[in-house]
Amino acid sequence: KLPHFRSIRVGGNGSIAVRDSDLHTYGIFMDETAQSPNDAKTLKKLEITDSTVLTGDIIGARGEYASVEEIVIRGSSIRLNEEYPYNRCTIGGGEQASFGSIDIQDSQIDITSSLNAPAIGNGWQVYYNRESRIRIANSEVSVRCASLGPAIGAAWDSGSGRINIIIENSTVTAKGG
């Protein structure tokens, strides 16, 4: 258990792997804000395998133009921690930032209060020319965006890219804001 407002962070162009763990954290992310897309950093890979995560903030990339290439969640449980005042939990990219792929398999996701961004997807105001993919397989997912967008996909005022969403053999409850 990490103390209040503590998180697992990595700098730009790094990777994070969480395996066989029980985490109580503020977030698991790369925290990089850039002034323009030309200066943007990317989290290469975030992997959560056979773990339980209670979080209050982003799992992926945080900050303007902070993108994530790949998120893999396998055999894990991820829930929103109501203790934290921000509750901005989003699995994916930050504001004005994209993601490559988010692959959730054999997992339980419960994020019922994402703020200003989808619970699974990218942050708001994303303009990018790429194809992204969200795959949910053999999982139970309950997600909600409190405002400015859908629960799964692209946030408010996003465009120019394409997101493919694939749901296989799963129970998904998703409510947009």
Name each model feature, range by range:
Residues 1-115, 120-145, 152-176:
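Surface-exposed loop/turn motifs in large extracellular/passenger domains
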